[in-house]
UniProtKB/Swiss-Prot annotation:
Species for this entry: Flavobacterium psychrophilum (strain ATCC 49511 / DSM 21280 / CIP 103535 / JIP02/86)
Keywords recorded for this protein, A-Z: GTP-binding, Nucleotide-binding, Repeat, Ribosome biogenesis
CDD domains found in the cross-reference section: EngA1, EngA2
PROSITE patterns: G_ENGA
Gene: der
Name by which UniProt lists this protein: GTPase Der
Function: GTPase that plays an essential role in the late steps of ribosome biogenesis.
Length: 436
C-alpha cells in the first residue's frame, strides 16, 4: 500500500502550488456541472521509483484568507492521524508567524516524520533568512521555491528517506478480496456490517463519527471468503463539526487504496451529496470496483420519489462513469443486504476478468471497421490490433498508425462497446492508444 503524505501549513504559503508540482499538474480540475472540485486535494506522485499519495490539507477550504487558527489546527490533527509523513510548509518572506508557531508546537509532539519546507527561497539572501526557521524546533529544514521548482528534488529525496518500512502482507491478506465500506458520517456503514454479521461488531449510535478505528472482519458468504472493512476513514472526531467533503475524503484514502471493491453507503434521506461524490471519485481515481448502496430507503416517502427517479439522479452525478450497480437497502430492516453483498462479489469478479486477445480482436475490430475514428486533417486513423493488458485492473490497448489523432470521445465509444459485450459493471477501465 502506498505511503500517504500530507501537506500542512497556514493559508497562502504555497501548499497547493507544491501539491500541484508534486503530482505534476498545473491546476485543479473543476467539474462545472456538479460544482465539485474533483481533483483538488488528492493525487498520486512518484520519485525514484517510489509511489506515494499526496494530500493538500488546504484543498477544500474556501475563503482561506479568513481561516482562523482553529481550522488549521483541525487540518493538522487530521494529517497527524491519517498520513505517514507530514510536510510543513512555511514562507521565508513572512518569517515565523504566530500560526506557524502553533502548528510547530503540535508537530513537535508527534512521532511521525515531519519535513519542514521553507518556500520562496530563490536566492542567496533568502537562504540566509531561512535559518530563522530552526527556531521552530523541528530540526533540519529544506528550502525550495514551489513556483520554479527549485529545491523540490532535495525535498523529495528527504521525503522518500522518511517513509516508514511497512511489513509485507500475509499470504491470506494477498489471497482474500478486500471490500471497503465507505461513506460519509452516519450514513449507516457500521449498521450495514452489523446487519450482515448478526451481532454488534461495531459500536453504533446516532452521533456521526462513532467508529473509532478501522476494523477488518473476515467474512464468508455464498462460499466466498473476503475481508470487510468499516473504515475509520469516514468518521470525524466529535470536535470536527463542519460538514466538509475534505474530512470525509482524507479519512477515506487509506482504506480505498487498499481495497479491491468499495461499497459506498449513502443516506437516502439526504441524497447524493458532495461528500458522496468526492468519495466515489476517490474510488474511481484509484481504479477500484464500486457498488452504491442507498441506505435508509425504508425512511423515504415513496410517493415523492421512486427508486427509478432516485437512481437517475445519482447517475447524473456519476457521469461519465455510470456503469455502476445501485441498490436500495435498509440496514435496520435488513432489506436487500444479501443482494448487496452478491453485487459486490460480482463486481470483484468483473474486475478480475480477462479477455483472450483473439476474442477481443474478433469483436472490437469489426466495430472499429464499421465505425472508425474520425479523420483529422485529411489523415485516416487505422487500428489493426488490440488487446487487454496483463494489469491488476482492466486496461486495454489499441494499436494505431496515428494514435495522437484518437480523441477522448472515441475512447469513450470503445469503452462503451467493451462494456456492451463484457460485464465490467462497477469497474473503471482504461483505454490506451499506442503507435503500432
Amino acid at each position: 500500500m502506498n505511503n500517504i503524505v500530507a501537506i500542512v501549513g497556514r493559508p497562502n504559503v504555497g501548499k497547493s502550488t507544491l501539491f500541484n508540482r508534486l503530482i505534476q499538474r498545473r491546476e485543479a480540475i473543476v467539474d462545472s456541472v456538479s460544482g465539485v472540485t474533483r481533483d483538488r486535494n488528492y493525487g498520486k506522485s512518484e520519485w525514484n521509483g517510489k509511489e506515494f499519495s499526496v494530500i493538500d490539507t488546504g484543498g477544500y477550504i474556501r475563503g482561506s484568507d479568513d481561516i482562523f487558527e482553529g481550522e488549521i489546527r483541525k487540518q493538522v490533527e487530521l494529517a497527524i492521524d491519517e498520513s505517514d509523513v507530514i510536510i510543513f510548509v512555511v514562507d521565508v518572506e513572512e518569517g515565523i508567524t504566530p500560526m506557524d508557531d502553533a502548528v510547530a508546537k503540535m508537530l513537535r509532539k508527534v512521532t511521525k516524520p515531519v519535513l519542514l519546507a521553507v518556500n520562496k527561497v530563490d536566492n542567496a539572501m533568502r537562504e540566509k533568512d531561512a535559518v530563522e526557521f530552526y527556531n521552530l524546533g523541528l530540526g533540519e529544514y529544506y528550502t525550495f521555491a514551489s513556483i520554479s521548482g527549485s529545491g523540490t528534488g532535495d525535498l523529495l529525496d528527504a521525503l522518500i528517506d522518511a517513509f516508514p518500512i511497512k511489513p509485507l502482507p500475509t499470504q491470506e491478506e494477498i489471497v482474500l478480496p478486500r471490500f471497503a465500506v465507505v461513506g460519509r458520517p452516519n450514513a449507516g456503514k457500521s449498521s450495514f456490517i452489523n446487519a450482515l454479521i448478526g451481532k454488534e461488531r461495531f459500536m453504533v449510535t446516532d452521533i456521526a463519527g462513532t467508529t473509532r478505528d478501522s476494523i477488518d472482519t473476515k467474512y464468508d458468504r455464498f462460499g466466498f471468503e473476503f475481508n470487510l472493512v468499516d473504515t475509520a476513514g469516514i468518521r470525524r472526531k466529535a470536535k470536527v463539526k463542519e460538514d466538509l467533503e475534505f474530512y470525509s475524503v482524507m479519512r477515506s484514502v487509506r482504506a480505498i487504496e487498499h481495497a479491491d471493491v468499495c461499497i459506498l453507503i449513502i443516506d437516502a434521506t439526504r441524497g447524493f451529496e458532495g461528500q458522496d461524490q468526492s468519495i466515489f471519485w476517490l474510488a474511481e481515481k484509484n481504479r477500484k470496483g464500486v457498488v452504491i448502496l442507498v441506505n435508509k430507503w425504508d425512511l423515504v416517502e415513496k410517493d415523492t420519489m421512486s427508486t427509478r427517479d432516485y437512481e437517475a439522479k445519482i447517475r447524473e452525478e456519476l457521469m461519465p462513469f455510470v456503469d455502476v450497480p445501485i441498490l436500495f437497502v435498509s440496514a435496520l430492516t435488513k432489506q436487500r443486504l444479501l443482494k448487496a453483498l452478491e453485487a459486490t462479489v460480482q463486481v470483484y469478479e468483473n474486475r478480475q476478468q480477462r479477455i483472450s486477445t483473439s476474442k477481443f480482436n474478433e469483436y472490437m475490430l469489426k466495430i472499429i471497421e464499421n465505425h472508425p475514428p474520425p479523420a483529422l486533417k485529411g489523415k485516416f486513423v487505422k487500428i489493426k490490433y488490440c488487446m487487454q493488458l496483463p494489469t491488476p485492473t482492466p486496461q486495454f490497448v489499441f494499436f494505431a498508425n496515428l494514435p495522437q489523432y484518437v480523441k477522448d470521445a472515441y475512447k469513450r465509444f470503445l469503452e462503451n462497446k467493451i462494456r456492451e459485450n463484457w460485464d465490467f459493471e462497477g469497474v473503471p477501465i482504461d483505454i490506451y492508444i499506442r503507435e503500432k
